[in-house]
Structure formats: C-alpha cells, structure tokens
C-alpha cells in the first residue's frame, strides 16, 4: 500500500515537472507576405525568451535565423533577413531550457521578390 502511494507521488511529481515546461505555439503571422527588411509580427502562446531562444525561417532544407526585435509571451516581432530567398517558408523555434529542441510551427510566410 505504501509503495503504491510513493509511486503515485513520484508519477504526479514527474507529470507536474513536465507540465511546467510550456511549449511555444504560434497561431498567426502578419503580414502573410513580405519582402526582405519588412517587420513581421507572430502571435501565439508561450513565446517569451525562456521558451523561445531563437527563431528561424525554413524551407525544410535551409534554416535562416532571424533577429528578434521584440518578444513577449504572446508576440514576437522580427525583420525578414537579407539571406531569405523568395518562397513560402515555415517558422521554426529553438526552445530554451535544459533540453533545447527545434520545433517547426504551423504558420508560414511567403517571401516576395524584391
């Protein structure tokens, strides 16, 4: 009986620790089309600096890091970097914390020709 209680406590503690690691989730990007140098605003949840360490634009083969100009829990602003090629690109985050992960987000932006 005591053993099952201890196991239950350990499981509850591990689930609580896991739940505290909030995962970033992007829900929209404005504008949906842009050119190099344009400012882009991404909205979502858990976008603060401790959960989103870096932000990339990716076509699935080439990842281009963007320079974040403003960042809060619900919004990230960045400029489209000169290295971006025209096309439809996904946003991808590098999470913060002890075990960083690259996570492609369900939002995309189209980079137009100059």
Predicted region positions:
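Positively charged n-region of N-terminal signal peptides that target proteins for export
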Residues: 1-5
């Amino acid at each position: 009986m005591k053993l099952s209680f201890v196991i239950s406590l350990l499981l509850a503690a591990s689930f609580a620790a896991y739940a505290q690691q909030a995962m970033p989730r992007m829900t929209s990007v404005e504008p949906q089309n842009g050119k190099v140098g344009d400012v882009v605003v991404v909205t979502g949840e858990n976008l603060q600096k401790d959960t989103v360490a870096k932000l990339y634009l990716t076509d699935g083969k080439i990842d281009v890091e963007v320079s974040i100009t403003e960042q809060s829990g619900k919004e990230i602003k960045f400029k489209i970097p000169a290295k971006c090629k025209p096309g439809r690109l996904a946003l991808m985050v590098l999470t913060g914390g002890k075990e960083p992960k690259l996570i492609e987000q369900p939002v995309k932006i189209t980079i137009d020709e100059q």
